[in-house]
Amino acid sequence: MAESSAATQSPSVSSSSSGAEPSTLGGGGGSPGACPALGAKSCGSSCAVGLSSLCSDEPPSKIMTSSFLSSSEIYNPDPTTPLGSETLGSHLVAKDGKDPLVLLDKKTLDSPQGTNKDRVDTPVSLAADIPCSHPSIPDSFPEQPTFLSKETDPTEEWVVKNQEPKNPSEVPSGEDRSALDLGQRKAEHICTHSLSPSEPAVASVEKDSPESPFEVIIDKATFDREFKDLYKESTDDLGGWAAHGDRESPADLLEMNDKVFPLRNKEAGRYPSSALLGRQFSHTTAALEEVSRCVNDMHNFTNEILTWDLDPQAKQQADKSPCTTESTGLDRSEHRSEIPVINLKTSPQQKMPVCSFNGSTPITRSTGDWTETFTEGKPVKGYLSSTKEAGGKGVPDSSQPISGSGAATVEVTLPDLRGTWPNSVLGEVTEVDSSGESDDTVIEDTTENPSVKNNKVLPEKSDSLPSAAVKTSERENKETTSHETVRSEMYENSEQQQAHAETPTQRSLEGQMSPQVPNMLNEVIPENLAMTDTTRVCSAAPPSVLSETGFSLTVPASAKSESLLGKNVEDTDGSSPEDLMAALTGTEEKGTVDKEKGDVLEAVLEKIANVKNTLPVELLHENKLSSSETKNTKSKYSEHSRETNGGAPKVSSDLEQEQLTIRAIKELGAKQVQAERMSPGGKLKRTFDPQSGPQNSSDILEHTDITTGSDLGIPKKPTIIKDTRIDSISSLTKTETVNKHVLARLLSDFPVHDLIFWRDVKKTGFVFGTTLIMLLSLAAFSVISVVSYLILALLSVTISFRVYKSVIQAVQKSEEGHPFKAYLDVDITLSSEAFHSYMNAAMVHVNKALKLIIRLFLVEDLVDSLKLAVFMWLMTYVGAVFNGITLLILAELLVFSVPIVYEKYKTQIDHYVGIARDQTKSIVEKIQAKLPGIAKKKAE
């Protein structure tokens, strides 16, 4: 509420014009009233309400605030004005002999927090039961100010009905001196703001000067004596304001009190000199030039952006109708100012209020996109009702008032829908039903579909959630401009709906799409805009989505619809042949609806960007569908009506529509897709060829294969073929394959089978002898000694051979080079793939061994654990007789002897082995039968 309190202090003269808080004088930091061209001390309190007066055609002597109210001319022409409504300026003329009153800090009780800080023109608003101070304007004020309107609320009368004209010589009462004591600490600074700041303070009191109608109380003691008592009363009165503010702190109240002091007649005594008037009159020309120059620069920059040709093929446009908007604030018919009053020190992304709905909620607009020209010569109509008229040239009955309690009227002229979209960003004019229950109701930057039927006025839900204004990114602009031709075709088809939608609740709102409104891209729509249960395309979907979806789907108004990711899309209305054809010809873009609460259009654009090189089939990747489903607006609504009534539609070959669709896809820069024509028998079929497109696209999650027979009376659901191009080999299968591969390499490189079966006697003998000698050496010597001897033997052989070859080459004078050069050039590096393959092979055995050990030691099976125990008990006796090396020697002997013996006596060995196996099995069964746990296990 600190911003609100600061924004409403503009009707009174401020004492903090010395630069203490220049940003709060005109409506909070960054508000247009801050008057940056005048410097830190240039913005006084009397111009804090509307700096647009500074930019108007009025002479400097008429630049006054719109907050001075005359006690003799306050009347209410219409007693139906609700409390809290805003008066858009008051034509109040001060009369001679009477002391006009200034309503101090006229605040609106139902004004939401954070809305006043963005206002361009702070309208004079009044709320009941608010204690106010009544400073006056002297009779000798130069050229009585002319204000904007003579309409006030009936609630204003209670503030001024008891005020009597003051005698110029009468001593000021307590109500007149209420707030001057707060400004006593700043009286010296006020004196220095006269036309001659270098002169002494006494010289600044100009009683006869037309530019200095006020007098300065130089004597601080006199100031305290006159205004001390009434300051306390005013402090008590202003203290009651805390009951009307939601979250006003004492610091905020002190800030309000510190900026206000009343004005008195010159004849009645001492008056503080208005530093603002002196500086305002002396710097009016400079301020006008500076503000005009900065605003013109901003307009030029914005117009240059808007004229960028992002898509050369989007030049085919119809005549554009200007979108003119009448804004609240100063009377444009009187001032005829086309320069919007903005704060030039703020960021270009600052939101500027254009008009107010429900008396408090502004429609914000970015100052960087401000290209709107205020309507001249037309007074703002309809102060007592908030309406927004959207009239389309070619769309009858598209002007829809929405009831409300605001005091702003915005008239928008919309173009014919048969024109194509502009080559810049798409504009949007939408209806807003603001109930005032949302503090920061804004409008999301979404596109309204022309197929929406909502002529019936519906109130907004009271539990509307505040939504944040979505900034339009450059990628969104480019994506929007690249789909203009498709939208143009859709709107030509949507014109046919006029003949089939005549009910009051199904009037088309096609006129709400304006190509002349690129500057309204940040204009906001409440997320909970009430709508009827009619089919429409979700506003979050881009134009390409609308042209690609080939299924007539219903749009639930509830925001809690379940997500349909990966499910079949239900064709609730029945798919017409036109819909199926549009679904088949559209390609490479997903019909996506991602209506999440902040991040709506970016997800859709990412999905579309990922699908540039996908299969030439219709992709219905519905990602997190949370509020509505998609509907194809390219289908003809006459056939849609017949489907709804139960009639069986007939398939008619529409070659022209197919060609238009293909041409639109070409203009979008996508791949050309050859659409199949319908057969004479009325059979429309498109088969899914998994080899027809690139197979390396991992973004495709689902493909739709739509096939319809000759009897299209019964709507068929699209068959969704899930893309299973993922490697079908599981991790276990891959590991087994690697194992087989490694074993095959080992068997091929080292023929173990041939080696142990003595296929090559020399090779087998060499290997057998070497290993046996090494094992015998390990039995006789230590491991270190054996390894050292082996290395010495190897080196002795290689060195001897190297020296021998060198001697031979020296004797023969040959250049054969190194004798081991062929072996030195061999690449024996182990690649990461090979290492991983070996590790995978080893890990299989390691994991198997670990699992077996856990099973045995944790007694998963009692018999297996007992077997291990018996084996280990026998090994204790073996270890007492043999050591490890001896066992290895015996194992080698068996390896090189048993296979060849078994090969020779296989039949006899198999017979005796079978007998031994049967005997062992019978013994094990007898043991298991006597154990208690085993019997229960078998019974189970």
From Swiss-Prot:
The keyword Hydrolase does not apply. Residues 1-24 have a biased composition (Low complexity). Residues 1-32, 71-91, 129-182, 314-335, 381-405, 428-512, 623-655, 672-701 are annotated as: Disordered. It comes from the Eukaryota. Residues 752-940 form the Reticulon domain. The modification N-acetylalanine is found at residue 2. Residues 472-490 have a biased composition (Basic and acidic residues). PROSITE patterns: RETICULON. The modification Phosphothreonine is found at residue 572. Residues 772-795, 853-875, 880-902 dip into the membrane without crossing it. Residues 895-940 are annotated as: Interaction with FADD. One of its GO terms (cellular component) is postsynaptic density. The modification Phosphoserine is found at residues 31, 196, 204, 209, 212, 249, 282, 508, 575-576, 652. Residues 430-447 have a biased composition (Acidic residues). Homodimer. Interacts with RTN4. Isoform 2 interacts with BACE1, BACE2, BCL2 and FADD. Interacts with ATL2. Interacts with TMEM33. Interacts with ATL1. Interacts with ZFYVE27 and with KIF5A in a ZFYVE27-dependent manner. Interacts with RIGI. Interacts with TRIM25. This is Reticulon-3. It comes from Rattus norvegicus. The gene is Rtn3.
